[in-house]
Regions:
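A structured, mid-to-C-terminal "fold-capping" secondary-structure block
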Residues: 164, 171-216
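Helix-turn-helix
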Residues: 31, 35, 39-72
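Alpha-helical structural segments
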Residues: 30-38, 42, 73-89, 100-104, ...
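Phosphate/oxyanion-binding loops and surfaces in catalytic or ligand/nucleic-acid-binding neighborhoods
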Residues: 85, 158-165, 169
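N-terminal intrinsically disordered/low-complexity leader segments
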Residues: 1-26, 188-194
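Hydrophobic alpha-helical connector segments
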Residues: 87-129, 155
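Amphipathic alpha-helical packing segments from all-alpha helical-bundle domains
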Residues: 100, 120-154, 160-164, 174-188
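Short, residue-level hotspots on alpha-helical faces of the histone-fold
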Residues: 77, 81, 104, 153-157, ...
Length: 216
């Protein structure tokens, strides 16, 4: 007998997705996901609960357990809907296609900043998450001599960490005296080329370029 979470994942994947006998459900998994995403976009992942999703859909808290039995199951639905299908990945060569992939995935994280709060515990479970990995694997030719799955997971991690940094930046300028204090205590750091690192997009681009250069 499958758990509720397993049944939801099977439904997302189209595995054993035959319609259950009995009355037709009023809501679809997409409706549950959309309601939960709306709450998370407004108040963060911590604001999401089964009770709040039920309230948004005008159903009782008891009724929502017919669709999802836990927040973990709900998050599976949310992630799959939020990342969505990967767009067409284009570029003049495979490295440029990897950069395009990173940029497009980063856009999804900006649309739904709460995604960076979901810490991976292994390979993903949702079909759309696998779709993004597959898109990058297909963007790299076989003769590139690259472990494409590892590359996809590495770049996904860079995007995730950068999204958290971007969300956490306060925009406040550092104290005016801090530069001199750093130079006095850490002269090697002061002598190194130094530039503003407050632009997460630029930092992500630098990190991705460093990874791709290392694969040449």
């Amino acid at each position: 007998m499958h758990s509720q979470r397993d049944r939801v994942l099977r439904l997302l994947w189209g595995v054993d997705a035959a319609t259950n006998r009995g009355p037709k459900a009023r809501w679809k998994p997409q409706d549950i996901a959309a309601a939960a995403i709306g709450i998370a976009d407004e108040g963060g992942l911590e604001a999401v609960s089964l009770a709040k999703v039920a309230e948004r859909l005008d159903m009782t808290t008891t009724a929502i357990y017919r669709y999802v039995d836990s927040k973990a199951t709900l998050i599976d639905l949310m992630v799959d809907a939020a990342v969505g299908d990967p767009p067409e990945i284009t570029g003049r060569d495979w490295r440029q296609r990897c950069r395009t992939w990173v940029r497009l995935l980063a856009d999804r994280y900006r649309e739904h900043p709460w995604l960076c709060d979901i810490r991976p515990t292994g390979m993903p479970r949702q079909p759309h998450a696998y779709g993004w990995i597959d898109a990058l694997v297909r963007a790299v030719p076989d003769d590139a001599d690259v472990h494409t799955l590892r590359l996809a997971l590495l770049l996904d991690g860079l995007v995730r960490n950068n999204a958290g940094l971007e969300r956490g930046l306060s925009g406040e300028a550092p104290e005016p005296w801090l530069g001199e204090a750093v130079a006095a205590r850490f002269p090697a750091l002061a002598a190194a080329p130094f530039q503003d690192v407050s632009d997460p997009s630029a930092e992500l681009e630098y990190a991705v370029d460093a990874v791709l250069r290392g694969l040449s």
